[in-house]
């Protein structure tokens, strides 16, 4: 859904306004999309109808921060919108965003595999995420698409990502870390 905001921004830049959407309108649209996504997952997307409203510290063993659902939503919105805009701000020069996103996606793919396997999750003291294999397939598709894109985005660039791609990729990274309960790992992996 972040793709629509990015596409509209790119469309405005090409046709009407050279600046595109204002930052406030982008953030407002991202907040609305995040709220709708959170509501949809909370209402329809869960197998056992329970959500763990905790934040897991990836550095300290068995370290959980329990928060209220409202604060959890604010935290989720911060993670998704923050990662989306961080990728958008990074996108600029030839291949500048594709390479790091490939590295971060590979890192998240490995962590997702480990959290989706009961033995590895228990051994490494990770939060077990049942049915994480679907996320692995999605991340593998993103990595493959980015490798293909990087070929044409490297100097001299023939294709540019624009806000359509960068907002989407950042949103994907934010949602993946939320689904695998490794929200605090994203800044570490992206650094």
PLM regions and their residue ranges:
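Carboxylate/His-rich catalytic cores and anion/metal-binding grooves
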Residues: 28-39
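Membrane-interfacial loop-to-helix junctions in multi-pass inner-membrane proteins
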Residues: 15-29
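Alpha-helical transmembrane segments
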Residues: 1-4, 37, 43-44, 49-56, ...
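Interfacial loop-to-helix junctions that mark the boundaries of transmembrane helices
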Residues: 20-24, 62-68, 125-135
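Alpha-helical transmembrane segments within multi-pass membrane transporters and channels
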Residues: 4-12, 16
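Glycine-rich adenosyl-nucleotide cofactor-binding module
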Residues: 63-81
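Interfacial loop/helix-cap signal at membrane boundaries in integral membrane proteins
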Residues: 50-68
């Amino acid at each position: 859904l972040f793709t629509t905001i990015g596409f509209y921004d790119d469309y405005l830049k090409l046709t009407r306004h050279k600046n595109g959407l204002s930052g406030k309108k982008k953030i407002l649209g991202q907040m609305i999309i995040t709220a709708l996504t959170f509501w949809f997952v909370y209402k329809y997307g869960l197998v056992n109808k329970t959500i763990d409203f905790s934040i897991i510290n990836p550095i300290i063993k068995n370290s959980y921060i329990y928060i209220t659902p409202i604060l959890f939503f604010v935290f989720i919105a911060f993670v998704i919108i923050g990662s989306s805009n961080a990728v958008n701000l990074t996108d600029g020069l030839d291949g500048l965003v594709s390479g790091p996103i490939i590295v971060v996606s590979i890192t998240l793919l490995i962590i997702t595999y480990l959290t989706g396997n009961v033995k590895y999750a228990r051994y490494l003291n990770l939060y077990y995420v049942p049915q994480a294999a679907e996320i692995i397939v999605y991340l593998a598709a993103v990595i493959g698409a980015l490798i293909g894109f990087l070929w044409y985005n490297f100097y001299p660039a023939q294709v540019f990502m624009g806000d359509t791609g960068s907002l989407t990729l950042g949103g994907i990274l934010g949602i993946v870390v939320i689904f695998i309960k490794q929200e605090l790992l994203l800044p570490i992996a992206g650094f």
